[in-house]
Structures are given as structure tokens and as C-alpha cells.
Amino acid sequence: MSSTTTVAEFAAELNKSPATLIEQLTSAGVAKVQASDPLSESDKQKLLGYLHASHGTVAADRKKITLVKKSTSEIKQADSTGRARIIPVQTIKKRTFIKRDDGSDMPVEEAQPEVLVAPQVQAAADAELVRREDEANRHAELLRRQEAELTEKRRLRDEQAAQEAAREREREAAAQKAQAEAVAQAAAAAQAAALAAEAAKKVKPTIGKIFKPAPVAPTAPAITVEAQKVIDTAAAEKTSKAAEAATAKAAETASLQAAAKAKATAEFQADAAKAVDLQERRRKAEAEAAGIRAMLSAPKRVLVPHVDPKIAMKGTLHKPVVAPGAAKPAVPAAAAPAAPGAAGKKEVKSENLSSTWKDDAAKKKGIPSRGAPVVPGRGNFRAGPRGRRSSGRDVRPESNFVAPTEFKVLEVHVPETITVSELAHKMSIKSSEVIKHLMKLGQMVTINQPLDQDTAMIVVEEMGHTALTAALDDPEAFTADDVQGQQAEALPRAPVVTVMGHVDHGKTSLLDYIRRAKVASGEAGGITQHIGAYHVQTPRGMVSFLDTPGHEAFTAMRARGAQATDIVILVVAADDGVMPQTKEAIKHARAAGVPIVVAINKIDKPGINLERVKGELVTEGVVPEEFGGDSPFVPVSAHTGAGIDDLLEQVLLQAEVLELKASVDSLAKGLVIEARLDKGRGPVATVLVQSGTLKAGDVVLAGSTYGRVRAMLDENGKPIKTAGPSIPVEIQGLTEVPQAGDDFMVMTDERRVREIATYRAGKFRNTKLAKQQASKLENMFSDINAGEVKMLPIIIKADVQGSQEALAQSLLKLSTDEVKVQLVYSGVGGISESDVNLAIASKAVLIGFNTRADAQARKQAENNGIDIRYYNIIYDAVDELKAAMSGMLTPDKKEEIIGNAEIRNIFKVSKIGSIAGCMVTAGVVRRTAKVRLLRGNVVIFTGELDSLKRFKDDAKEVKEGFECGLNLKNYNDIEVGDILEFFEIKEVARTL
């Protein structure tokens, strides 16, 4: 990596946009404007220090950086059929940089690309494998130490090279200085020679002037010229010697420098080769250790030693031509390992790939190469059909035989419902084995049929395994995590009070007086058919009230009210005393473990006896405080308001004793009191918050339904934003109408809420299907023997979930052995067109309880003759359905004697038989009536009349005191004095 890069290149390395990097550089104090601006190492250090400071970490002086680069490539490999297959290969490269003292980053370690290839496992003794693994580990440790020593040597060599370079620079400077001095001396010599020549020229005319030349002395000019030549020659020789000396010295310096560089280069290359060799040896040692570990952990297989030469040649589309006399290539024993030098190459051998390719190569015949000799009977395509058929016999495929293991007892966790295939998978056997065992147990099942928990556990025990009751895949376990994470402070909360008692004892009127509102007048028939929730502010604090129905059909509603409450107000009318629903309310309160405050109502009526009421309550186990019990008795009048304040004081006193607390700053939890389907708002649920705070927008899980709270209303219909503990509210936004009595909770993860709701819905469905299947199999023969049973199919649509539940239970109780109520569907909301279509298909009666049908549904019902009945009071619905079922009952048959006649004469007529002449002694004789023949007060014959005549005319009836003639049908053994008794069979309607 270069020391100077541009902003754009550095941003690409960091996977950031150049604009973001420029902003960070500007914040770090590095002024960069464009992406093409250069970026130095100091700028990068400033940016790194700024980022460390901004993230709150101390910038450490990092000496070593390792970069890991992963790249995925693909190679094409041809199988035995010639088709190319693409194989992904992942290559991992590592590069380590160490910061030197001179500030440069030098790569000290570059890991070879690692290609993931499956190790070939060879069978060996465990002790030998352990020894080899230890040896490989020691070898790897030795390589690591050698690598550390090599790094230290390299550092020392670098320091020595730096010192030698400094000394070399000094020698070069000295040589250059000497060369400069030699050049200067040569220049000085040349200058001196020039000056001498010039002086000689000046001397020549002076001599001519002073001395007259003799005719015999012409040698003066020759001597001067010779002297000049000598001087020039001496200067040139001196200059050339100095230049030669400088050149020789420079050449010597250059040769020394080149030798030093060559030596350094050779040492560097040798060190690099040694590092590569060490790295390669280290990689091989680690690979060998990994192979040994894989061999230790791999299951043992029994391998067949035979390997066909044709199969041993992998990855070759066209087999090489082998001469008939040539020797076949030797088969490498146990897949010979790759050569040591080929470890760094990207080679993917086909024998290291998936075993399915080996199977394909073994099963399918290879394509013969061009020019290969044709050998008959060896699988060649020119050898005829016999050769093709016999080709597979010579090739023995690789055996995948697994040594048999002894039976292993498994712990099988059985949920509430499980299919046959899932149960077989848990026991690691085939589904057919489970089906066989179930057939032995007398159950005919299919592979996808759900089994209940008891049946599945019996099968597991029969198969020899251990059955455990569990639901490991239950996502509801995550709900506990969310609850445990909340550690909020518990604060005092308002009590939740449930008003219970018999019907028409004044529960709603009492609550109405407390709330100062007219609630009872709004209920149909003056009786409560819904569970109501209200909260009231009193001088001593807030109290939340739950008003439950008193009718016997609303048992489930009362049970829910008792479970959600803190205190129960048991309302008993002073004139009626303890009634059946009063006893039931006491049982619900005892089961819930809540204190009871008894309110004896209607004390303003004349002729009441409070002591009688107290005695009846003591008989049921509710003992007043004045008798030494724990239940306060308060006489009240909902009409005049007498005793209401005392009742509230007793309730708040009980609440103080209980010390009711709940967390406020946590996720809300509570109970679904009531639910209905509103045509405009969708599913609406009345919930009571028991802990935490419910807010608009929270994700709520209620049973098998979920949703986000879109709106919240109080009991007066006013919108609110939050609801704390003990506050009843109406919420909207659920996906479906929840079941009344379900727990609801607020969770933070909507995806997890959806998973839990889906799991609960599927669990409910599977449990229901399993129960239905079991009942069908068990009751199959009993239904055949019972004969035809009349069914009354009904569809119930109610306004709220509680009313629908109560009405359905009341109507199902009307079923008898002859007429059964078949509940096709029950739901909440108005009667829609789909409900009418369901009634048409099932021939059911539609019952609307406080609901009506829309225009399309009414029109379709009229066109198809569907009966829709509307009710507001549960009594009327039960009574009318009871009458309808009574009409479906088979009427009873009853005999009624209408008259007697005495035989006084017998007439024999051919072709007719005996004709009896009779006198009607009592009642009347009719032609259509049945007759009994009595002889000596013993019945001899019972049958019908063939004819009845008075004189010669046919008669329909003959009254008392008249004579008649009659003939019995198919009977002639009559005697004088026999008595004929006439009777009719009448049908009498039955009632339930």
C-alpha cells in the first residue's frame, strides 16, 4: 500500500462515500475539499486519533495490523456425463503490516490463500492419531519459534544494512572529493603550462633586439619549440594520470556498491523464500493436525479395499487411450495426497468433492475417447446390447456399509399433539414402524395424523425409549423473559370488587346506586346478561367494580369475575334467602381464595327475617363476624340507599388488610373480561389491567389473538390514553375477537407476538382435531348401534363473547339421546351473508342474541327459507328451542279401548270363512279399530277387522246396544261366547 493515496481511494477502502470521509477529515482538522486531494499517512493518523477520541477510546500505538481478505470464486468441473457443474471456492488471504521505526509499513507476513477442501479420513488407531496430533502441534510450535527468530534476524539485518548504507554514502562522498581534487590539480597544471608558453613568446623579441644574431646560431627557435613540447607533454601526462586515477576510484566504488546491493537483494530473497517455506510448513502442520482431529471425531466405516482403475480416474471426461500391451496405471493407495509444492495452487480435485459425484461416476458409463480400442462385453456402446447390460456387473461401486450399532435409548420430548411422522423423526425410525405399533394397539392412523400426548407417550415407551412431557418448540417461553426483565417498583393499587349473587337479588341496582347511574334499566328484562366493569371514586379512594350475571347460564362469567377480583360482594335478598346461584357464587369465591363481604339487600321490604338469612349462609360456610367468622354482613337497600356507605367502608377496610400492590412503570398485564365484534370498529375487548400501564399503541397478546391498541375507551365511552392497574378499559385493534377470560399482556417485539399467537392457534386446532378423531374412532360402533339420532343444527350470533358462550352452553344442555343440538358455528357480531350461506349449507336455524341481520342477509334468508330468530332474553331463547326440540321427539303411542262385543252366533260362508254375529255390549265398534279376541279372559288373537256390516249394509261404526256382523282378517277360529275387545292407538306428544 502506497504512503500517499487520494481521498476517493481511501473512502473506497473504508466502504464509505467520499463526502462522508471529507466531513470526518474536516472534523479531525485535515483540510480536504475534493475527492482527488492527496491523503498522507499523517492525515490518516490524525483521522484515526479523532475517531478514537470521538468513540471514547484511547488511541494506542499499534505496531501490527493484519488484513483479512475473503474472495469467492467459481470453477467449472465436468462430471462423468459431460455436464459442467459450478463449484464455489472461498479463498482467504491474510496480510500483516508492522510499523517500523522509520515510519514505513513493511509487509512481514502474507498468508497463503486457504481453500476449504474436505480432509480425507483414513482409518488408524486412536493412540497413533493422538501421537501424530501432538507431534503436529509441536511441529507447529517449532515453526512459530523459527518464524519469530527469522523476524528478529530480519530486523537486525535491516539495521546492519542501514549502517552499511551510511558508511557507503561516506565512502562515495570521499571518492567524489578526491576526484574533484584531482580535476582541480589537472586544471592548475594546464594553466601553468599555458602561462609558461606565453612567457616564452615574450622573451623571443627581446633577445633579437639586444643581440645581433650571428649567422651561425639558428638553434634558438628550435630550443624554444622543444621546450614548449616538453612542457605540454608533461602537463598532458599529469592530467591523464589524474583522470585515470579518478575513473578507477569511481569504478571501484561503483563495483563495491553493486556488490553490496546484490548481496542485500540475495539475502532478502533468501529470507523471503525461507518465510514462504516456513509459512507453507506451518500451514501443512496445522492442516495435518486438523485432519487428525477430524479423523478422531469421524465415525468409523468399514471400507472395501477394492478400487477399480476405471473409477479411480476422476475429473476426466475422455479417458486416455491405453495400448493393449501397455501396463495399466497404478492406483494410488488411499487417495495419494497432493505434492508439497502444490499446496499454494488453487486446485480442486474431483475426488475431494461430494460423494454423490462419485456415485454418479460409478453408476453411469463414461463416454469413450476417440481411437479407443473396442473391447466386446466391456460396456462399450459398440459392443451390442449384451455388452451394455453386462457393463455394470464388472464395476463394483464403492460400498457405504455402516457397521451396525447397538440400540440406543433416546429421551423423546412429546408435546400435547404430534403427528406420526414427527414422532418417528424424534425416535430416528421410519414412520411405518410407528404405524405398525399403533395398529397393534388397535388404532388405524396415517402418516400425517395428529396423536394426543398420552397415545404418543405409550408408543414411545413401547418402542423402548423414554417419553418426557414437554413442548420444546413452545415460543411462549419467551414471554417469561420479557416479564423477568421488568423490575419496577410495586405501588398500592385500587381493589377490584366483584358483585355476585342470585338473579333478581338486586346486584345491578346496588351497583347502580353506588355509581349514581341507571344501568339496570338498560338491560333487557331487567336482568344482567353482560359482565360490566366500572371504577368509582369514593372519599377513601378508588374502587373498581365487576358486575356479573346471576342467571344459571352465566356460570363461566361468574367464574371469570371471581378469578379477576380481590374482594367479592355477595348480594343476598332478605326476602328470598340463599338460592342456587348464591351457593355457586360462594363456591367461586372460595375457589379463587378471595374474602367475601355479604350485602343483605331489600331490607326495606316488610316481613323480612335477617336471622334466617344469616343462618342459611352459615350453613353454606359463610360465617358473620358477630358469630366469630371472617365475613362482614352489611344490611343494605339499593332502593333507599341505606347501608351503602357502611358497605363501601367494609370493602375498603378489607382492601387495606390485603395490602394490594402492583407495578405501574412496566408493561401491562391483565384479563380479558368481555369481547365483542363491532361492525364499525372491529373486534372490541373489555380488559382489566392488573399490573403495569396500558398505553395506546402497545402491542397486545390476548390468547391466540394479537394486535396494536388503536384506541382505548373507559366505561363511559370516553377516549383515554393510558390505563393503570385496576382500571377496566375497552381496547380496539385486535386481529380477532379474543376469548373471554384469556390473559392479555403487552410485549415489545411484534414479530414474537405474532409467532406466539400463531403457535397458540395451531396448538388449539391440533388438540381439537386430535380429540375429534379419538371420539370418532371410539364412538363409531356405538353410533351404528344407536340408530338414527335427530339433529337440530343451530348457528348462534351474539353481541358479546360471554353471552354467546352462555347461550351455547345452555342450548347444548338440552340435548337428549333422541334429539341433539348441533352447534354449527357461534360467534359475535351481526348476522352477515356468510352466516346465512352457512345456514343454507348445514340446514341450520340462525339465532341472533342482541344482534340483527343486515339487508343482504335478510334477503338471502327469505329467498332460501332460512329461519332467523331474534332474542334479547336468554330465557326466551332456551324456551323456544326447547319447544322446537320437543316437536322433533318421537311421540309416545297409547292404546285406548273404545268398545266390547260378544259373539252370539257364527255363520259359515264359503270363500269368506266364519262370520260372527255380535252384540255391542259397551262403547262403540269402528271398522278401522284393532280387535282382540278374548276366550276365558285370555287373549287368543289380536288383529284387524276384514268387514263390518249391519244387516246387509257396510257400516263404519256400530254403537252400544246394536247387533252387527263382522269378519276377522285371516282368522276363523271363533266360538260362541268369545268377547271381542276393540281399541285404537293414539300418539301422545312428548316434552323434554
Curated annotation (Swiss-Prot):
Stretches for region G4: 601-604
Residue span of region G3: 547-550
Annotated PROSITE patterns: G_TR_2, IF2
Main localization category: cytoplasm
Domain of life: Bacteria
Region (G2) location: 526-530
Ranges for domain tr-type G: 492-661
GO cellular component assignments: cytosol
Region (G1): 501-508
This protein's UniProt keywords: Cytoplasm, GTP-binding, Initiation factor, Nucleotide-binding, Protein biosynthesis
Residue numbers spanned by region G5: 637-639
Region (Disordered): 154-173, 338-399
Protein location: Cytoplasm
Residues involved in GTP binding: 501-508, 547-551, 601-604
GO molecular function: GTP binding; GTPase activity; guanosine tetraphosphate binding; translation initiation factor activity
Protein's job: One of the essential components for the initiation of protein synthesis. Protects formylmethionyl-tRNA from spontaneous hydrolysis and promotes its binding to the 30S ribosomal subunits. Also involved in the hydrolysis of GTP during the formation of the 70S ribosomal complex.
Family: Belongs to the TRAFAC class translation factor GTPase superfamily. Classic translation factor GTPase family. IF-2 subfamily.
PANTHER family (UniProt xref): TR-TYPE G DOMAIN-CONTAINING PROTEIN (PTHR43381:SF5), TRANSLATION INITIATION FACTOR IF-2-RELATED (PTHR43381)
Protein name: Translation initiation factor IF-2
Organism whose genome encodes this protein: Polaromonas naphthalenivorans (strain CJ2)
Lineage summary: Bacteria, Pseudomonadati, Pseudomonadota, Betaproteobacteria, Burkholderiales
Gene that encodes it: infB
